């Protein structure tokens, strides 16, 4: 299935989401969170080898780091969006793999993004991104969660490593209004980063291929048809356990749904 081309933002602003491969946690303790914040800080405040400032690669308007995924509201400046996100992902994955003595992919192969073309949606996303921990049951209030950019808005003098262009946000909406809105739940009509069934199926395929390559050295899911039954069944069970449905396994491997059902039950 061909990948759908990313939509281009008229404003240069995008909502980006990165998620751990197989939805695994990508932040295990505070040191991990701080490392990622530092990487974001370096993106907006780059320096050359001698420590002299370079033009900023991007503007970041808000972020939120959750245990197995993260959100960014970002505008690319001197580099393409894909290059910026790739740079962030590689820097963090290198740190994470070294610290935890692991190999292979850390993030899903393809990050999610959507263009932000109007002011109303920009404000909706500021609220949505900061409300993620509340919606996920990790905090009662936006201000209680330590790993989002909200502290940069509410208490900038307490922020140890500023990342966001908060002034660009408060030039569009007053701080008083933002504070009153940020803990107000979004309506169900505020659709944020929805993806079609085809896009979800494509992401499952990419996750499965990465999983098979990393753990079993298998580059094509249809290779499972030629494996000894015991090994094939063990791999199918592992893939099903990571969340791939029997229907999707059948489509990708060429095995019948009945065969897969017997293998994973």
Language-model features and meaning:
Residues 1-62, 66, 75-265:
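Short Pro-Cys-Gly-centered "Cys-loop" motif that presents a nucleophilic cysteine in a tight turn
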Residues 69:
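Short acidic-rich active-site patches of cyclic nucleotide enzymes
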């Amino acid at each position: 299935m061909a990948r759908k081309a990313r939509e281009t933002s008229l404003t240069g602003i995008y909502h980006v989401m990165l998620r751990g491969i197989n939805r695994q946690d990508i932040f295990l303790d505070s040191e991990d969170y701080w490392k990622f914040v530092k990487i974001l800080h370096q993106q907006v405040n780059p320096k050359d080898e001698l420590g002299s400032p370079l033009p900023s690669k991007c503007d970041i308007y808000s972020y939120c780091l959750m245990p197995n995924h993260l959100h960014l509201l970002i505008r690319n400046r001197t580099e393409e969006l894909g290059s910026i996100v790739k740079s962030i992902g590689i820097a963090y994955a290198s740190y994470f793999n070294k610290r935890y003595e692991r190999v292979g992919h850390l993030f899903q192969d393809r990050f999610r993004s959507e263009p932000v073309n109007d002011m109303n949606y920009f404000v909706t996303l500021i609220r949505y991104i900061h409300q993620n921990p509340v919606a996920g049951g990790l905090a009662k209030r936006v201000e209680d969660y330590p790993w989002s950019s909200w502290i940069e808005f509410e208490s900038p003098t307490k922020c140890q490593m500023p990342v966001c262009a908060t002034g660009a946000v408060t030039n569009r909406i007053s701080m008083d209004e933002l504070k009153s809105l940020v803990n107000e739940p979004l309506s169900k009509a505020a659709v944020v980063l929805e993806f079609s069934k085809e896009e979800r199926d494509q992401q499952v395929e990419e996750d499965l291929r990465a999983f098979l390559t990393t753990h079993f050295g298998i580059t094509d899911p249809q290779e499972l048809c030629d494996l000894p039954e015991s090994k094939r069944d063990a791999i199918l069970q592992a893939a099903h356990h990571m969340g791939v449905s029997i229907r999707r396994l059948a489509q990708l491997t060429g095995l019948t749904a009945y065969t897969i059902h017997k293998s994973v039950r």
